[in-house]
Amino acid sequence: MRTNNMFKVAILTISDRGFKGEREDSSGPLITEMVKDLPGEVIHYKIIPDEKEQIIEALKICTDGLKADLILTTGGTGLSPRDVTPDATFEVIEKEVPGFSEAMRAESLKKTPHAMISRAIVGIRGSSLIVNLPGSPKSVKENLEVILPALPHALSKLKGDPSECAQE
């Protein structure tokens, strides 16, 4: 649901070191700034550790409790044993929306071959869209720039917008 014609956005930074206060979160504030153009209003921001059950719980709070339109996670999308954000997200979503993650990887591959190791997924739970973003601010910016133009339409569709998807 939109408040004041703004999409409700929740941001979850997944980082063991950020959670312990050993590293400042730069990606969460960057996301906050970038979603203003949706237009988006950040209604929830939290740093949580790379613990699958805690990520699942946080995602459910954002979708089922807070009824956020968009949940953006940052961090935990790689191959390290502690990178479990996509695994937790997969357990929470009802449908995957692969076009977003494919677009992010395709654009990132133009800059680095390391984009191939991203396991980030995007999906929906109820009427919420959950997007996994990488952890580094540079990658967050690059990935968000790719998907931001499509987010308002996708979020409106999730809310039941009956207009046609085709554009002339």
Give, region by region, the residue ranges found by the protein language model:
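Non-catalytic beta/alpha edge segments that cap or flank active sites
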Residues: 1-168
